[in-house]
């Protein structure tokens, strides 16, 4: 009687991890193949650059420069973050400062507009 694939699978399931690694190495040597190549083929083709460039959904709003009107920038940062006056002043003077992390696109754009209206330079990352 021939050994079935299910018999082999059951035998491998009972082996320790080290024994399975040894078995894979022996199969690679015997058949002249690489298990890594088989995994890559099974995974399918790699996505092209167009597919890999998915649109970001979360943005970090970074204050790059407070501009000429630091008081307006401090007020805008306080309103956006809820920081106290001293903390907001330190943040504005210590640019670059991440005002908000992982904001939605709409929220990040609105915050950027608010800070730019106060005279600050802002980046979305």
Curated annotation (Swiss-Prot):
Record text on subunit structure and interactions: Homodimer. Part of the ribosomal stalk of the 50S ribosomal subunit. Forms a multimeric L10(L12)X complex, where L10 forms an elongated spine to which 2 to 4 L12 dimers bind in a sequential fashion. Binds GTP-bound translation factors.
Full protein name: Large ribosomal subunit protein bL12
Protein purpose: Forms part of the ribosomal stalk which helps the ribosome interact with GTP-bound translation factors. Is thus essential for accurate translation.
GO (cellular component) term, any one: cytosolic large ribosomal subunit
Keyword Ribosomal protein: yes
Keyword match Lipid biosynthesis: no
A Pfam family it matches: Ribosomal_L12_N
GO biological process: translation
Molecular-function annotations in GO: mRNA binding; structural constituent of ribosome
Key words of the record: Ribonucleoprotein, Ribosomal protein
Family: Belongs to the bacterial ribosomal protein bL12 family.
InterPro entries: Ribosomal_bL12 (IPR000206), Ribosomal_bL12_C (IPR013823), Ribosomal_bL12_C/ClpS-like (IPR014719), Ribosomal_bL12_oligo (IPR008932), Ribosomal_bL12_oligo_N_sf (IPR036235)
